[in-house]
C-alpha cells in the first residue's frame, strides 16, 4: 500500500494548471537506494513498476505515459559516485520497455538542509545535462 506523499499535492496542482485529469502510477519506496529500482534487482521494484504501468494502461487504453517523476537520493548519500550512471540506465530501461524513447524524466531535488546530502544533491543537479529529455525541480529555498 502506498502512503500519501508529495505526489498527491503535485498532481492536484498540475491538474488545476493544465485543467485536465492527471493519473499517477506510483511505486514509491521510502528509504530505498536507487540500485534497488534497477532492472533485475532482487527487490523486483523495477518489474513491479512496469507491471503497474502496464496494468493501468490495460485498464485505461486511452491513456499514455507522459513523464517519469523521480524524487529519491537520501539513501544514496554515501554511495553517490555511480548515482548518475545507474539513474541513466534505469531511465533508459524504462523508456525502452515502455517503447517511448523520448519519455520525459523529471527529478525532484532532495532537500539541501542536511549537509550529509551535499554530494548527492550535487549529482542530482547534473541530471538535466546527463540524461536526455530530463529536467530538474530545485529544492532551493525550501
Q: Positions of the model-derived regions?
A:
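Cell-envelope and extracellular/periplasmic
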Residues: 1-142
Amino acid at each position: 500500500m502506498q502512503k500519501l506523499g508529495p505526489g498527491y499535492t503535485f498532481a492536484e496542482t498540475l491538474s488545476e494548471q493544465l485543467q485536465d485529469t492527471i493519473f499517477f502510477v506510483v511505486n514509491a519506496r521510502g528509504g530505498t537506494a536507487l540500485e534497488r529500482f534497477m532492472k533485475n534487482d532482487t527487490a523486483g521494484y523495477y518489474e513491479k513498476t512496469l507491471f503497474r504501468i502496464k496494468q493501468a494502461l490495460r485498464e485505461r487504453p486511452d491513456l499514455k505515459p507522459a513523464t517519469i517523476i523521480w524524487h529519491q537520493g537520501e539513501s544514496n548519500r554515501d554511495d553517490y559516485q555511480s548515482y548518475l550512471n545507474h539513474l541513466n540506465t534505469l531511465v533508459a530501461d524504462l523508456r525502452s520497455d515502455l517503447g517511448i524513447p523520448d519519455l520525459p524524466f523529471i527529478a525532484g531535488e532532495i532537500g539541501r538542509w542536511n549537509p550529509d546530502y551535499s554530494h548527492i544533491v550535487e549529482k542530482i543537479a547534473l541530471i538535466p545535462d546527463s540524461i536526455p529529455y530530463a529536467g530538474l525541480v530545485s529544492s532551493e529555498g525550501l
